[in-house]
Amino acid sequence: MIDVNNEYTVKIESVSSDGNGICHIDGMAVFVPYTAAGDEVKIKITNVKKRFAEGVLTEIIMPSLDRTTPDCGIFGKCGGCSLRHIKYEKQLEVKRDIINNAMRRIGGFKDFNVSEIIGMENPTRYRNKTIFHADKNSVGFYSAKSHTVVPVTDCAIGAEENAEIINAISEFNMTELFTRKSFSTGDIMVCVKAENTDAKKLTAAVSGACKSVKSIYLNGENIYGSAAITDTLCGIEFRISPESFFQVNPVQTEKLYAKALEFAGLDKTMTVMDIYCGIGTISLCAAKKAKRVIGVEIVERAIDDAKENAKLNGISNAEFYARGAEKIVPYLVKSGEVPDVVILDPPRKGSDEKTLGAILRSKPERIVYVSCNPATLARDARFLSDGGYTVSKAAAVDLFPHTSHVETVVLMSKVSREPSLLQL
């Protein structure tokens, strides 16, 4: 019987969707962080549930051929980079398996296979946004599954300038710091949450330490420089405010959007509906290829940015609605909007049946689903499949090297059968 504190020697069989190694003891699945498929290891059980258990790695007896030495001093301590101990090319295989398993097991697409996964040539320093937390003693990241701060002076996947900013700001009574960097201009935005902090002293410290800082916010108020910075994706300039959703890896985002637009197959006769459009990144890229684009997003500030971004780039064939997709999409369809192509890029929780049902009623020729969560992608793709669409193509783009997260693009094409009453 498996029990807490029991120790075992096991061989890791595979890697789970959250990056933990999987082994089996007496028929029960055991999840062990920071292990790789093929590892022979000693583990200690830390938690036992009805159907699975959790353990920690105590010793590597025989390392897997997939292993590499992590190039990070806080690997295994902070809550990020759960796959940094695995060779990068193997990380891509793990992510392909995660997607395939979700689509087959959850979605019921038995023959599903990701045709390609696009990795990074240089999977380091790729994040344009980094969030740090602080306690009385240090600035850093939360450790896994806790609010304990792991001190950090630098992060190998974040901007190099973060080290200068952390050093300058550590003397202030801060609770949170996040930075944004424009990869096209090099400009940096610094946003600080702090109590009893002198804005002038903070500004002097940060701007003096890092000349690339062009915008500083303190507790939500712009105290230095511009209210936003700009970055360029696919030849389009985007205005980014503190609240804006903007993909964290611009290098790979361009590849992601290129793949989504390839699947969309747009021409200048087509109307596109972009659901969960954020600040209009995909919408404005699509507008260059389509007759008309309709963008939908629940966050009003993001829609303000989307409209501003359209003006900034001289794009007049994109319109935006600030309302929840589950409300505005059914309304637009009922009002007679008939998109040729629907692109949706929902948050991790996926879409919902009201939105998906409205998409089915609009009968677009193609649906391009961009997802950061294979499980909810599989669920929603099954709903759309039952409503008359088939999975035609699928590709993955690695926006998050060294983590278990991955972006997937799926093309669903209309087939002859009509949606069932459940979808309508």
Segments (PLM) and residue ranges:
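A short linear hydrophobic-aromatic micro-motif
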Residues: 43, 174-179, 392-396
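Rossmann-like S-adenosyl-L-methionine
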Residues: 2-7, 11-17, 196-424
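Nucleotide donor/acceptor-binding cores
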Residues: 128, 188, 269-270
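Extended interfacial segments that mediate partner engagement and assembly in macromolecular machines
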Residues: 58-70, 76-174
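Internal alpha/beta scaffold segment
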Residues: 149-181, 185, 193-217
